[in-house]
Curated annotation (Swiss-Prot):
GO molecular function, one term: ribonucleoside triphosphate phosphatase activity
Signal peptide: none
Assembly description: Homooctamer. Interacts with VP1; this interaction is weak. Interacts with NSP5; this interaction leads to up-regulation of NSP5 phosphorylation and formation of viral factories. Interacts with host DCP1A, DCP1B, DDX6, EDC4 and EIF2S1/eIF2-alpha; these interactions are probably part of the sequestration of some host SGs and PBs proteins in viral factories.
Protein name: Non-structural protein 2
Role description: Participates in replication and packaging of the viral genome. Plays a crucial role, together with NSP5, in the formation of virus factories (viroplasms), which are large inclusions in the host cytoplasm where replication intermediates are assembled and viral RNA replication takes place. Displays ssRNA binding, NTPase, RNA triphosphatase (RTPase) and ATP-independent helix-unwinding activities. The unwinding activity may prepare and organize plus-strand RNAs for packaging and replication by removing interfering secondary structures.
Species this chain originates from: Rotavirus A (strain RVA/Cow/United States/WC3/1981/G6P7[5]) (RV-A)
InterPro entries on file: Rota_NS35_C, Rota_NS35_N, Rotavirus_NSP2, Rotavirus_NSP2_C, Rotavirus_NSP2_N
Enzyme Commission designation: 3.6.4.-
Active site feature: H225
Similarity comment text for this entry: Belongs to the rotavirus NSP2 family.
Length: 317
């Protein structure tokens, strides 16, 4: 995750701003600079290579002292920064909006995936600039639309029906902020269209998840799509989701947290997010992740949860 101000800076032209991507040498200057505390939140002038991000964001970049940041000296950093600027320059950002736009925290990996989609000649985003910019505006939180299959970050498609597409995320292959744990495996499920879904299509998805992904929990981060994650990583997701929810409320970004379809979401996660929305503490909410829940009556006739061992998928073991 990183603020948009880590990728570009605003240049006032008439009554609105044009956004310009940072170059890696300017960032490198900023990372070596001694800057007064009072100037930590201001864009840094490298004198030689142009404007650099505010020094308060130093930890967002990979250095000898911090291996958890972005690999800003890779070509991918420039591609992501240029893509963000293209999207921001396609809309009008005024002086009253610029600070809130640049303070938005975005998923670096999501944006790298959009660059990868853009460069894939077989992908619809390669052929449609309008759809590409729409996808970026959704990714950076500027659009109220949800991420659907056409505008999704992408990955490897492992399941699709008339209503849903399930992607295996490819973060291990990334260059900007790769996942270093080689055991990482995670999926995302997007809706093909933002409209009501028939019961038969939901049933198809649930059957696929129970047969093939029984070692995973289906959760949501509240943004209109599902995530399929290892049970061992659920607590980590809970910490992140709770922190983001609290931060948004504190900053006045009252974004509706979408609980999605209770029949698809793991029972304990649904309880956790419902409790979070009611204003309970993280400790109270997380207890619900580890409680034994009363099994819901099966919402679909003919869809059994019982499987013989040789029928059960070994994915995730």
């Amino acid at each position: 995750m990183a603020e948009l101000a880590c990728f570009c800076y605003p240049h006032l032209e008439n009554d609105s701003y044009r956004f310009i991507p940072f170059n890696s040498l300017a960032i490198k200057c900023m990372l070596t600079a001694k800057v007064d505390k009072k100037d930590q939140d201001k864009f840094y002038n490298s004198i030689i290579y142009g404007i650099a991000p505010p020094p308060q964001f130093k930890k967002r970049y990979n250095t000898n002292d911090n291996s958890r940041g972005m690999n800003y000296e890779t070509p991918m950093f420039n591609k992501v920064a240029v893509l963000i600027c293209e999207a921001l320059n396609s809309i009008k950002v005024t002086q009253s909006d610029v600070a809130s736009v640049l303070s938005k925290v975005v998923s670096v990996r999501h944006l790298e995936n959009l660059v990868r989609r853009r460069e894939n000649h077989q992908d619809v985003l390669f052929h449609s600039k309008e759809l590409l910019l729409k996808s970026v505006l959704i990714a950076i939180g500027h659009s109220k639309e949800i991420e659907t299959t056409a505008t999704a970050e992408g990955g490897e498609v492992v399941f699709q029906n008339a209503a849903f597409t399930m992607w295996k995320l490819t973060y291990l292959e990334h260059s900007l902020m790769p996942i270093l744990d080689q055991n990482f495996i995670e999926y995302k499920i997007t809706m093909n269209e933002d409209k009501p879904i028939s019961e038969s299509h939901v049933k198809e998805l649930i059957a696929e998840l129970r047969w093939q992904y029984n070692k995973f929990a289906v959760i949501t981060h509240g943004k209109g799509h599902y995530r399929v994650v290892k049970y061992s990583s659920v607590a980590n997701h809970a910490d992140r989701v709770y922190a983001t929810f609290k931060s948004n409320n504190k900053n006045g970004n009252m974004i509706e947290f979408n609980l999605l379809d209770q029949r698809i979401i793991w029972q304990n996660w649904y309880a956790f997010t419902s409790s979070m929305k009611q204003g309970n503490t993280l400790e109270v909410c997380k207890k619900l992740l580890f409680q034994k829940m009363k099994r819901e009556s099966n919402p679909f006739k003919g869809l059994s949860t019982d499987r013989k061992m040789d029928e059960v998928s070994q994915i995730g073991i």
